[in-house]
Amino acid sequence: MATRVVNAGAQRLNKPGAASRCRWPAAALLLLAQLALNAHAAEEFTLVVAPGDTLIGISQRLLDDPARWPELQRLNRLKRDIRLKAGSRLRIPLDWLRWTERTAEVLHVQGVVVGTGPGAGAPWVAGMQLKAGDGFDTGASGALTLRLYEGTTVVFSPQTQAALGRLREVAGIGVQATTIELKKGAADSTVVPLKNPASRFEIRTPRVVTAVRGTRFRMAAEGDISRHEVVTGAVAVAGVEPGRAASETSLKEVQGLRAEGASLGTPVRLLPPSDVSGVPVRIERIAQSVGVPPLAGAQGWHWQVASDAAFSRLLQDERTPEPTWVVTGLPDGDYHLRVRAADAQQLEGLDAQQAFALRARPEPPVLLAPGSGASVVGPSDMVWAEAMDAPAYQVQVARDARFADLVLDRAPVVGPRLAMDATWPPGQYHWRVATLRAAGAQGPFAEGPRGPFGDGATFTVLPPSVMAPPQIGTDGVHLTWTGPTGFSHKIQLATDPSFASPQFDQVVPGVRLDLPTPAPGAYFVRTQVVLPDGRVGAWSSPQKFEVPQKVEAPRKYPWPLLLLLLLPLL
């Protein structure tokens, strides 16, 4: 079984407005596909005769066997070897030409890519020159970019096995023949328009042959299943299996199809590019989640990172079922992110691309205390995990989450701890820490003396507790105080201002307490807030109060009885 895809008008489609004007009739496309099924041996090269050319001279210059000039004469129906008319056209079968072998250059290697077959040798590196027959395996996480000729490149994704087939040309006339055997995996080819119509660029899978003359075309193969996606240009597709009628169709720009064996699926329009406006252009974390909005019809996403906008230097390649991905495992640098959505047939849509700068080092430390949402009472420290090899830190505290209203900006801070300022008024604060660069650690992407600030944490400085003057009533002593609401408070009552032996020492809820009237004398009372984790605030200033001695009330005599006692005196 063999299927060949032939570029049908890619050069026209590269001109402005050509996409709307190019309407290849189905018959013409299928004819092209059928013609393409004939091997290179049946194809011809048309030579424009130059002044002074002869059949013998042309044969000596171009033919693999110069003695075939009489056959060339008969093919072109020429009567004798006389000087040919300048500007006339001479037909020459491609398999008569004198081909010379070319090489392909390894432009980029990511991860480990190894050669396959006899004499495979060490892992491949950039700059290697490859010849026809060289095979390779990108492994689970490797990627490879080959430069073939005149800007034509092919990028092979992870888990790809392929080999170079034909790599040849005819010197002096610009006829080239390139074939890549894609056994499994995926290839993304960018083919510059071939100058000579007799030139061929083919990628063959176990079931499909794709031939282009200048287009952006993606292929993937896994067993009998293959996927074909035309980004620019137009192609004709014919699937042929011995003993069966050919299956034929056409693919236009922004179309794709899925083939199973020789059976070609119905062409469908590729999904549009995703919206990458929400992808950050600057990343300051070694692991950063990125995402795109869901896309109608999408059932998967293909993410790639490269060091160049053309994606010839592929660094990462991964697929996810959801429109989110984690960028990680990259050194600081400038990168390009590319994502495309895949439909139910796993046909991948148009690219969406976003450049970003990764500036994540030196990494900020992890904040330990106060944690986000914590309450602070009394003297407290800000504490963070100590980063390895960190010479010092920069600490910022602000009243706002954007750190525009700073109350503290201190550097260098040596060690993983800094005391809070006791003068900060009650309220909410935000704090964060950055690691300073070591001396001489200014790399090519270092910006300033420090790395990025870490994620900030929010804490609240609670107001101090204040004890109100106690009120002594006939039913006891009434205590009230002000302080942070929603917390318990500890109350101490003592007869000495040192509170060495308090008569009352308990934690109570709320901001009010009623006690029985103690024995007469002087007393001192104070309070402190108690947080749920057991931490306590500062003691309030003690309040002193006096419980007076009890005074005997005068006796009361009945007035009538008093008058009776006074009668004898009258």
Give the residues covered by each predicted segment.
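Primarily a LysM-type cell-wall glycan-binding module
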Residues: 41-63
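Extracellular LysM carbohydrate-binding repeats and other cell-envelope/extracellular binding modules
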Residues: 61-101
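Flexible, surface-exposed loop/linker segments and immediately adjacent secondary-structure boundaries
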Residues: 86-89, 94-286, 565
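Conserved aromatic anchor
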Residues: 288-297, 380-390, 477-486
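Short beta-strand segments within Ig-like beta-sandwich modules, predominantly Fibronectin type-III
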Residues: 315-321, 408-414, 503-509
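Surface-exposed, short loops/turns at beta-strand junctions within beta-sandwich domains
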Residues: 328-334, 421-428, 515-523
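Extracellular fibronectin type III
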Residues: 345-358, 436-461, 533-547
